[in-house]
Amino acid sequence: MISLREFIFSNNVNKYISKEDLYSLFIIIELTSKIIHNYIILNNITRIKQEKIKKNIHGEHQTKLDLLSNKKFIDMIKTHYNIAGIASEEEAKFISFKQEKYGKYIFLIDPLDGSLSADCNTPVGTIFSLYCRVTPIGVEISEKDFLQPGNKQILSGYILYGSSTILVFTVKSGVHIFTYHPFFSTFFLSKKNFNYPKKNNIYSINEANYNNFSLGIKKYIMSCKSNNNISSRYTGSLVADFHRNLIKGGIYLYPNTKIYKHGKLRLMYECNPIALISSQANGSSSDGNINILDINPKILHQCSPFFVGTKSMVKLVNKFILGYYNHN
C-alpha cells in the first residue's frame, strides 16, 4: 500500500507548489476531514445539525453542521505557513491570515456540500482548490487573488464521506484517488492517473425541475431516456453524484432554470474544482456554452450552470442547448 505521504514525495508535482508545501497542506486536510467525518457521525446520534441557524450569502439555511465544518477548516487552513487567505462558500467575504503578506497561495472551499442530506446518511463532501496569489509577495492580499479562472488552479480536490472516506485530487498531472484506512489513520492510494471509462452509462439531474428547464435540456433528457444503455442516477449531493459518474462514466447536469437564471452552483467553490478534476480525468465541463475553466469570474460568489462528465456527453449537451437556444 502506498500512503499519501509516500505518493507525494515519490512523484513529481506541478511547478507551482513544492512537495513540502503540498504535503503540509494535505496533513491539514487529512486531519480536518477526520474531524468533519466525526461531526457527521455524531450528527446522526445527537442531531447537532437539525437546527437551522441563519442564512448564508446565497440565501440558503446554514445548519450547525455547516458552521462547525466551516469554522474547523478555516481554523486549520490558517495554520499553513504559506497560505495567505481563504474564501469559503459559507462566508460573505474572503478571510486573510496573519501571514497574508508572505503566503504564496490562496485557498477556496465548500466545507460541507450536501449537508442537508447528512441526516439521511446520504454521502456528502468537502470541495477545495488552491491558487497562486496574483498580488506581489509583501503586500496584503485582495479579492483579485481569488477572482481567477479555474484554469489557474494549481490543485483541486474533494473528500467524499460515504461508505468509506475518499480523497480525490489533481495537481494538474492526472487524477489520484485515495481511501482512508481507519486502522492506520491515513489515506492510501486506490487509483493513480484515473480516467473516465470509455462508456457513457449515467446522467444525473434533478428532474423535479423539468418544467423549468430550457427546451434544449428537455430534449437532451429525452435523448438519454431513449438510450437503453444510459441510466438516471441522482442523489442531490454534488460530490457523490460526480464521483459515481467519474467511476462509472457519465454526466452531471445542473442547468439554469426559470428560478435560477444564472444557475445555482457556485463557480469558485463547486464548479471550478470539480471541472479541473474532470478535465484531468480526460473529461470536460461546460456552462452550456464555454468550458467552465475558461470563465473569468466577476464576483466571489458567482453562480453558473454546470455540466460535467465525459467529453462526448458534455459535447452533446452543449449541442442540444445551443441548437434549441432560440426556441425557449
Curated annotation (Swiss-Prot):
Binding of substrate, residues: N206, Y234, Y252, L253, Y254, K264
Places the protein is found: Cytoplasm
Sequence positions that bind Mg(2+) 2: D110, D113, E270
Cofactor note: Binds 2 magnesium ions per subunit.
Cofactor requirements of the protein: Mg(2+)
Record-level GO cellular component terms: cytosol
One term of GO molecular function: fructose 1,6-bisphosphate 1-phosphatase activity
GO biological process, one term: fructose metabolic process
Catalytically driven reaction(s): beta-D-fructose 1,6-bisphosphate + H2O = beta-D-fructose 6-phosphate + phosphate
SUPFAM superfamilies documented for this protein: Carbohydrate phosphatase
Binding site for Mg(2+) 1: E89, D110, L112
Pathway in which the depicted protein is active: Carbohydrate biosynthesis; gluconeogenesis
InterPro entries: FBPase_C_dom (IPR044015), FBPase_class-1 (IPR000146), FBPase_N (IPR033391), FBPtase (IPR028343)
Keywords (A to Z) from UniProt: Carbohydrate metabolism, Cytoplasm, Hydrolase, Magnesium, Metal-binding
EC number, as in UniProt: 3.1.3.11
One Pfam family matching this protein: FBPase_C
Primary location: cytoplasm
Subunit: Homotetramer.
Family according to the record: Belongs to the FBPase class 1 family.
Full protein name: Fructose-1,6-bisphosphatase class 1
